[in-house]
């Protein structure tokens, strides 16, 4: 009896160890585009290089800027997207032009008034490298910055290299396709909320579908992620922005970002942003939290220094796009005669259409709403096939 139990226990331990080992091996087998110097360094020789980078642009533990400087690459400009070069600016906070104190290289903001660099700014740039970790959601603005940088490169005859990285939400394609009249910086391309593509794949699609001016003129090179597939698990080594601190927040982001157009808090001003929802005076649940001012993440969060009650989603298994949180909160506030879509225009920009908001206001269920965009998703999935790398 003892021997049988022992061997059963040993077998289970061995199986668990094997699974863990294989998972670790899979993680270590991945080489992001930036790590594959042999595939792009020859292109940079004797060229003036501009980098679109932030805190996620790492080669192992070393920033791409430092890695390239150590290899004597001539970096003339660093272009900073939303949240800044160091990733220490709150969402929507102004990013200023500056000079990097460590390297002396000019920092050019591409978030704010000047989202697309002028011919003058690019006059000393031969090649632009884009290396930023994305999360696979249309309204996450790094892909909008990539769009404008690609367009500027095409117009000025500058080469464009994308050093690809995994998409933590690559398994999901969901949400309405963006309609042209709702185009904005939080949604430029006619793609779903969750597009299931890496930035490299999306760059190929932007060029191939002619979504930028002079798309045919753009010399684009994508360095794929080695050892990566659409089923490869990937945990981000660095938080991609101040309010997406972990894998759980990234998984919930597509579902909770719509609350930004409402009076409801999604936890900005806490250590668990995009992992909770809360409101006052209407209690959305039993969980309570109090947002505080956090420099570089949430200086003036909703309900600053006020306790709100709602739902703790830190241990939920939500993935993809879940509309029930939004629909349930709408019903609770409406019953209490509280205005829900207080920023209706912004809601429609996030959704890429007014149909989602109108359907919620009309009382449609999540299943009915999702059914309404299935034809568009089917068309998109077919359209993207030529551009997929994994």
Regions found by a protein language model. Name each.
Residues 96-125:
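Glycine-rich oxoanion-binding loops at beta->alpha junctions
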Residues 134-146:
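Glycine/threonine-rich flexible loop motifs
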Residues 226-303:
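Glycine-rich, aromatic-lined ligand/substrate-binding cores of catalytic
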Residues 183-254:
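Conserved anion/nucleotide-ligand pocket segment
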Residues 1-27:
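Bacterial Sec-dependent N-terminal signal peptides
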Residues 76-82, 163:
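Short internal beta-strands
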Residues 273, 277-372:
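Conserved functional hotspot residues or short segments at active or partner-binding sites
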Residues 87-92, 161-183:
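Glycine-rich, charge-decorated loop segments at or immediately adjacent to ligand/cofactor-binding or catalytic sites
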């Amino acid at each position: 009896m003892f021997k049988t139990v022992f061997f059963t226990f040993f077998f289970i331990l061995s199986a668990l160890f094997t699974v863990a080992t294989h998972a670790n091996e899979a993680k270590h087998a991945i080489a992001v585009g930036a790590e594959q110097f042999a595939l792009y360094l020859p292109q940079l020789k004797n060229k003036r290089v501009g980098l679109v980078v932030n805190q996620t642009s790492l080669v192992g533990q070393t920033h791409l800027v430092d890695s390239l400087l150590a290899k004597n690459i001539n970096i003339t400009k660093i272009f900073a997207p939303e949240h800044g070069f160091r990733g220490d600016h709150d969402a929507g906070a102004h990013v200023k032009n500056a000079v990097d104190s460590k390297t002396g290289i000019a920092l050019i903001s591409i978030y704010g008034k000047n989202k697309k660099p002028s011919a003058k700014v690019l006059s000393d740039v031969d090649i632009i490298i884009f290396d930023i970790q994305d999360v696979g959601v249309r309204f996450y603005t790094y892909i909008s910055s990539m769009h404008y940088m690609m367009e500027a490169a095409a117009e000025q005859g500058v080469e464009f290299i994308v050093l690809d990285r995994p998409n933590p939400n690559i398994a999901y394609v969901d949400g309405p396709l963006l309609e042209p009249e709702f185009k904005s910086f939080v949604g430029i391309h006619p793609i779903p909320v969750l597009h299931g593509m890496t930035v490299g794949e999306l760059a190929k699609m932007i060029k191939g579908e002619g979504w930028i001016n002079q798309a045919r003129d753009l010399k684009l090179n994508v360095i794929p992620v080695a050892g990566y597939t659409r089923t490869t698990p990937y945990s981000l080594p660095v938080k991609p922005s101040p309010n997406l601190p972990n894998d759980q927040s990234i998984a919930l982001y597509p579902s909770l970002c719509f609350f930004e157009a409402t009076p409801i808090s999604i936890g900005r001003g806490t250590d668990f942003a995009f992992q909770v929802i809360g409101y006052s005076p209407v209690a959305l649940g039993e969980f309570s939290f109090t947002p505080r001012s956090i420099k570089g993440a949430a200086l003036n969060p909703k309900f600053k220094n006020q306790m709100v009650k709602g739902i703790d989603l830190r241990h939920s298994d939500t993935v993809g796009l879940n509309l029930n949180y939004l629909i349930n909160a709408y019903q609770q506030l409406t019953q209490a005669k509280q205005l829900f879509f207080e920023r209706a225009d912004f809601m429609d920009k996030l959704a890429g259409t007014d149909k989602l908001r109108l359907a919620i206001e009309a009382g449609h269920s999540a299943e009915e709403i999702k059914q309404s965009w299935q034809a568009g998703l089917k068309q998109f999935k077919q359209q993207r096939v030529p551009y997929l790398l994994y």
